[in-house]
Amino acid sequence: MRQSSESKQKLYLYNTVSRAKELFCSSNDPVKLYTCGPTVYDYAHIGNFRTYVFEDLLKRTLLFFGYSVRHIMNITDVDDKTLAGACKKNISLDAYTAPYIQAFFEDVASLNILPADVYPHATHYIPQMIEAIAKLLDEGIAYVGQDSSVYFSIEKFPTYGKLSQLKLQDLQCCSRVSSDEYDKENLSDFVLWKAYEEKRDGHIYWESPFGKGRPGWHLECSIMAMELLGASIDIHAGGVDNIFPHHENEIAQSESLSHQPFSRYWLHSEHLLVDGKKMSKSLGNFFTLRNLLDRGFSGEEIRYMLLQSHYRMQLNFTEEGLLACRQALKRLRDFISRIESVYPESSHISEDMQQHGEGFLQAFSEAIANDLNIAAALAALFDFIHQTNSTIDQANFTQADANYVLDIMKRINTVLGVIPFSADLEIPDHVKQLVEEREVARSEKNWKQADALRDQVASLGYSIEDAKSGPKVKKL
C-alpha cells in the first residue's frame, strides 16, 4: 500500500454480506475493485449514474487514503436487451451497441468520473465463458435443460443466498429461468448458456460444445472479474438491484469455479427516485444524463446532486434540488475566486490558519472514512469556507494563507471531484467570441453594444469582470 499523510486513517465500509460496517483491510497492492458497468442497449439514465458516481467516490477515497487501485468496469454488450435491439434493427451486435458505448464514455467524462483501468467487453471473453461452463458441467454443478440451454443448479451451492440473505429451504423454487433478470419470487436455477432460437436471436450466436447460443449475463461478470483480477478480489460494487439475482449468481458461479471466496467486500448504492417516485418512462420522469445537459444543467451540477447524499440512502432527484446544487457550486466557485485573489505577502502560514486547516482535514477524513459519509464531509467543507471567509473579512489573511487553503481545497477535491477551480474552467468558443466582440465595442466606446454583449454572455451562464490585464470570464 502506498503511504501518504492520510494513510493512517482507518476506513470502514458497509459490507452487504454481513449487513454491518467493517474495517477495510487489503492484502493486495493494488486493491482489486470490480464494478458493474453499463448494459449498452440504450443511453444510461441518471439512476445508473448515481451508482457510478458512488463507485467513483469509493475509488477516490481509497486513493486519498494512500491505496493504489486496479479498477475493472465491464461493458455488457450481449444480453437479452442488446440482442433484442440488434435483431429489431437487423444489424450486428457491434453496430447496435457501439453508439451507446461511445455515449457512456462521453457521459462519464462530463461527470468527472475517473476512468477504470480496463473496460472489458463481454463479447471479447466468450471462449473463457465456454471453458468455465464446460468445467461446471464436468463437476455436476451445471446441467443441460430440455430447452438445450445450460443451467447452474443452485442446490449444488449450499451457501446460495448468503448475499441477499435468502434461505433455499424456506423458499419454493421454480425449476429454472432463462431470462437474465428475475425477482426473488422466481428463485430458480439460472442460465449459463442460452440456447439459440432463430426467431428470437436472428443472426446472433456463438458456437460451443453445448450448441449455438450465447452466455448468460451473470456468468459474464464472473469471468471478466476473474480473468482480469484473479479468483479473489477485494471489493465488488453496484446498485441494490444487482444484489439479487446478479451478484448472488456471480458468487455461486465464481466460487464453484475457484473454490475461493469471490469478493471480501460487497457495496451497494440505493435507488434514485424522481420527485419521490420510481423513475419510469410511462410516468414521464425518466431522465438520461443527456436530457439534463440539454436542459442547461452542467455535468458538475449533476455530479454534485448525485454525490451529496449517503450512498445507502435513497436519493430523491428533483429540479429544485438540482438548482440548489447550482447555488452550492456557485458558493464554492466564489470562494475559490476569493482565495485566488492577491493578498499581502508573508513568509509563513499563520498559526490560526494552520490549526483551522488541519482541523478541517481531520474532520473531512474522518467523515469519508466512516463508510463514505459524504454529507458530513460536505458539512465540514462549508464550515471551513465560512470560517475562512470570516478570517479574510477581518483582514487577517496573507498570500501564504491563501496558498495553503487552495492546496487543501485541491487535496479534498481529489475525493469530491466537483470544486470548480478557475484554472480548470473551459470557456466555450462561442462565449470567447462574444467577449472579444465586447472588447472591440469597448475600444470603440460603443457602450450600448458592450452592455448588450455582456448580457448575452450572462444568458449563457458566464460573467465578465473587467480588469487592467483584460476581461476575466467566470461561470455564474
Curated annotation (Swiss-Prot):
CDD domains: CysRS_core
SUPFAM superfamilies: Anticodon-binding domain of a subclass of class I aminoacyl-tRNA synthetases, Nucleotidylyl transferase
UniProt cross-references to Gene3D superfamilies, sorted A to Z: Cysteine-tRNA ligase, C-terminal anti-codon recognition domain, HUPs
Record carries keyword Nucleotide-binding: yes
Biological process terms in GO annotation: cysteinyl-tRNA aminoacylation
Cellular location(s): Cytoplasm
Cofactor(s) for this UniProt protein: Zn(2+)
Domain of life from the UniProt record: Bacteria
Keywords: Aminoacyl-tRNA synthetase, ATP-binding, Cytoplasm, Ligase, Metal-binding, Nucleotide-binding, Protein biosynthesis, Zinc
Cited Pfam families: CysS_C (PF23493), DALR_2 (PF09190), tRNA-synt_1e (PF01406)
Record-level GO cellular component terms: cytosol
Signal peptide: none
Membership in a protein family: Belongs to the class-I aminoacyl-tRNA synthetase family.
Protein name: Cysteine--tRNA ligase
Source organism (scientific name): Chlamydia caviae (strain ATCC VR-813 / DSM 19441 / 03DC25 / GPIC)
Phylogenetic classification of the source organism: Bacteria, Pseudomonadati, Chlamydiota, Chlamydiia, Chlamydiales
Gene that produces this protein: cysS
